[in-house]
UniProtKB/Swiss-Prot annotation:
Oligomeric form and interacting partners: Part of the 50S ribosomal subunit. Contacts protein L20.
Keywords of the record: Ribonucleoprotein, Ribosomal protein, RNA-binding, rRNA-binding
Protein name per its UniProtKB record: Large ribosomal subunit protein bL21
Family annotation (InterPro entries): bL21-like, bL21-like_sf, DNA_repair_Rad51/TF_NusA_a-hlx, Ribosomal_bL21
Cellular component aspect of the GO annotation: cytoplasm; ribonucleoprotein complex; ribosome
Gene designation per UniProt: rplU
GO biological process terms on file: translation
Function of the protein: This protein binds to 23S rRNA in the presence of protein L20.
Length: 193
């Protein structure tokens, strides 16, 4: 039995046991992923989707995250200009081994769906959640922009009271951003109300 699946804008004809190099997926080595975009199932009774086969899926195990071979992009302006540029590129890929082709019941398996690079986007809201709990808007202090406020929150200083309570040694120990004495004075005023 074989299946035609779609991932990363490409289509692959696969069987159980095949090893594929697909566009980078948000999964670590050893994890199981499921491709839900199945265009066709083949075998004794072929099924062609319109455009997808309902309930069908292909499960795979992630072997490794790799880079493809280097592609050289060479640009040369001929004749009077005599300029040239060479750039190389190695595409990020995921190596997967097909373990199973499901003809039905794909939504009940509990295996996570294979998606692109969503790991970085998922981490950003998780980092913003601790900042929202019991913190002040540090950008109200003159000279503290959004980037400096974010670095202060990452250093554990998320409120005016925490910034006002810093000693000179603690201020010197903060490497992420240079805390100015005016910031501490303004934080004391804002913490009092």
């Amino acid at each position: 039995m074989f299946a035609v699946l779609k991932t990363g804008g490409k289509q692959y004809k696969v069987q159980a046991g095949d090893v594929l190099r697909v566009e980078k997926l948000a999964a670590d080595a050893g994890e199981k992923v499921q491709f839900n975009d199945v265009l066709m199932l083949g075998g004794d009774a072929p099924v062609v989707g319109a455009p997808l086969v309902d309930g069908a899926a292909v499960q795979a195990e992630v072997i490794d995250q790799i880079k493809g071979e280097k592609l050289i992009h060479f640009v040369k302006r001929r004749r009077k200009h005599s300029s040239q540029r060479t750039k190389g590129h190695r595409q990020k890929l995921t190596l997967v081994r097909i373990t199973e082709i499901l003809t039905s019941g794909a939504d009940k398996t509990g295996v996570k769906a294979a998606t692109g690079q969503a790991a970085a986007g998922a981490a950003a809201p998780a980092a913003a959640a601790p900042a929202a709990a019991g913190s002040d808007d540090l950008t109200k202090i003159t000279g503290v922009g959004p980037a400096a406020a974010k670095k202060l929150v990452e250093a554990g200083i998320g409120s005016f009271a925490a910034l006002a309570a810093l000693s000179d040694e603690q201020i010197a120990a903060i490497d992420a951003v240079k805390v100015k004495p005016e910031w501490v004075e303004q934080a004391k005023e804002l913490a009092q109300g």
